[in-house]
Amino acid sequence: MDRWPDNRAWLLLLPALCLLALVGGLPLLAVVNYGLHDIFTLDQVHWVGLQWCEDILHSDRFWASLGRSLLFSALALGVQIPLGILTAKLLLSLRRRAVWGLVLCALPLVVPWNMIPMLWLGMIQPQTGLFGFVGAWGYDYKFNPAHTWIVILLVDTWHWLGLVAILAYAGLASVPQAYRQAAAIDGASAWAVFRHIELPRITGALAIVLLLRCVDSLMIYTEAFTINAGGPNDATRFLTLELGEEIKGFSYGQAAARASLYFLIVLTIVWAFVIATRREEPTA
């Protein structure tokens, strides 16, 4: 006779779920409500329904900024995931000394977000910067869109590469050494060991990294705004910058509608990721 599953453990999560609903659910409902109104002041609020969402969805600027955000996210993942795995492999070869490498990887994660772009802008200043010599090579992040993208991608990679490396290292360190030794006896190459032994056993950690970095890269704001304020010629004008400008312009109704659409985009990506992950899980 089958026994009913014991779900009493969910009671332990109840306080955290209530707190999450309070600090996350209520503000989200407030934003959705604001997005359905035209707000001038606290006393002048008019119902507009889905008008703001329709205007945004019919705007060419919205789709252009969405395309730039998705492109940046794809580039960030394409650069940071392989580099993070490579860094983790290097740390794994250091054995006990890997702890110092992990500390170095974690340092950028504790630097305040608003200080990171300022730090890098200072290093590429032609007169006093550590890498100021790149200006002599024709590098101009202020007026060249490709150069601006390179700076933003470099800054974001420096900031978050440590997270990818640490999680990938945790996955690689959990692989039994006996598997690698058996592969070495069989004459397997380093790539074969990684492809058939290590990679299948770190897919869980990589899935978490992929999801976190995908969502984080879509939220990029500080780097793009500080480095070139969305320029040149709106080349780095991401969704977050559009939202920030509407908030600064006191267009709270439009900003709330844009934030709601932004939330739906991220939620769709997370949902698609969860569905894809479940399909890859072996069935019992």
Regions found by a protein language model. Name each.
Residues 5-284:
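A structural signal for multi-pass alpha-helical bundles of membrane permease subunits
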